[in-house]
């Protein structure tokens, strides 16, 4: 089984195997999750100063902010043209 990588915008890449959820940042509970992650030091801001459009939650409790729409991230996750790394190649 290889490692599947997904582009979350501006050349930032995340391991797709570690994703738990891709959500919109608009609701109050998600804003609370973002603030709690910031307080714990588990927030990764990959927006490059742009508006946050997607919040990615990982199985390690890291919260990643992306400037790409959640639908776009999900579409990249489901396509076959994504980046895949075989463990044998490493």
Curated annotation (Swiss-Prot):
InterPro entries in UniProt: RemA-like
Superkingdom per UniProt: Bacteria
Residue pairs linked by disulfide bridges in the UniProt entry: none
Family matches, as NCBIfam families: MtxBflmRegRemA, PRK04323.1
Q: Which family is it part of?
A: Belongs to the RemA family.
Please give the HAMAP family that the UniProt record associates with this protein.
Answer: RemA
Q: List the protein's name.
A: Putative regulatory protein Cbei_1140
Species, as recorded: Clostridium beijerinckii (strain ATCC 51743 / NCIMB 8052)
Taxonomic lineage is:
Bacteria, Bacillati, Bacillota, Clostridia, Eubacteriales
């Amino acid at each position: 089984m290889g490692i599947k990588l997904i582009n979350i915008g501006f050349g930032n890449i995340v391991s797709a195997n570690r994703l738990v959820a891709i959500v919109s940042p608009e609701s109050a509970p998600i804003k609370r999750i973002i603030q709690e992650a910031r307080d714990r030091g588990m927030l990764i801001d990959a927006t490059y100063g742009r508006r946050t459009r997607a919040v990615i939650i990982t199985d390690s409790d890291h919260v990643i902010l992306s400037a790409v729409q959640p639908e776009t991230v999900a579409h990249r996750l489901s396509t076959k043209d994504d980046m895949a790394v075989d463990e044998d190649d490493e």
